[in-house]
């Protein structure tokens, strides 16, 4: 009976560690943020942040307006240069890697959709810049439209959509390039029911 209980306990412990990699002494963080700071003149937007985020982990940053959440995300994405510190993603120091070469996509709070493009053109924009084959682009855009439930609205322009629909366009555009890291700034701000 003791051997059986011990086996169950060991199995549960191993299962728990697999679900909580930060408890595994051998697990390597997928994202490491070390001493990250950002100064804007005399204002410290982000002050000496240290974080380890593991592969498959969902990580949320909560805080009041102006506390540095968006600035931290923008530094991870490469849109802001840290004043101090280091960002490592998948073992690679991102210090000298421009935003367009990082394995990161970001969905902005303001959506940043192109007003002169249709929904499908907005979603396909990144793939066209990567010079993917036309048939691959069509297929992936179709998958994304289905995923965000906008297939019926593919030919519409952003001004013809609700705020939540525009947000789903931005989400599809962020997901279509299959980033290793997806950063969402205020992701639930305008979603429709």
Q: Which residues does each PLM region occupy?
A:
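The feature captures the beta-strand-to-loop junction immediately N-terminal to the Walker
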Residues: 62-64
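Short coil-to-helix segment of the ABC ATPase nucleotide-binding domain corresponding to the Q-loop/switch region
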Residues: 117-126
């Amino acid at each position: 009976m003791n051997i059986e209980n011990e086996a169950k306990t060991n199995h549960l412990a191993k299962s728990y560690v697999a679900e909580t990699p930060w408890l595994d002494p051998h697990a390597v963080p997928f994202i490491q943020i070390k001493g990250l700071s950002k100064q804007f003149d005399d204002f410290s937007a982000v002050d000496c942040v240290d974080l380890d985020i593991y592969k498959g982990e969902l990580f949320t940053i909560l805080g009041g307006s102006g506390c540095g959440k968006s600035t931290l995300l923008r530094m991870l994405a490469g849109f802001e240069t840290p004043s101090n510190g280091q960002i490592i993603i998948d073992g690679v120091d991102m210090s000298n890697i421009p935003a367009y070469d990082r394995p990161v996509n970001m969905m902005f709070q303001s959506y940043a959709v192109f007003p002169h493009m249709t929904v499908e053109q907005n979603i396909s924009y990144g793939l066209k810049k990567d010079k993917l084959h036309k048939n691959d682009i069509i297929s992936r855009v179709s998958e994304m439209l289905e995923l965000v439930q906008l297939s019926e609205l593919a030919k519409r322009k952003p001004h013809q959509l609700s705020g939540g629909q525009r947000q789903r366009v931005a989400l599809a555009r962020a997901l279509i390039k299959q980033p290793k890291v997806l950063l969402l700034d205020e992701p639930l701000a305008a979603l429709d029911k």
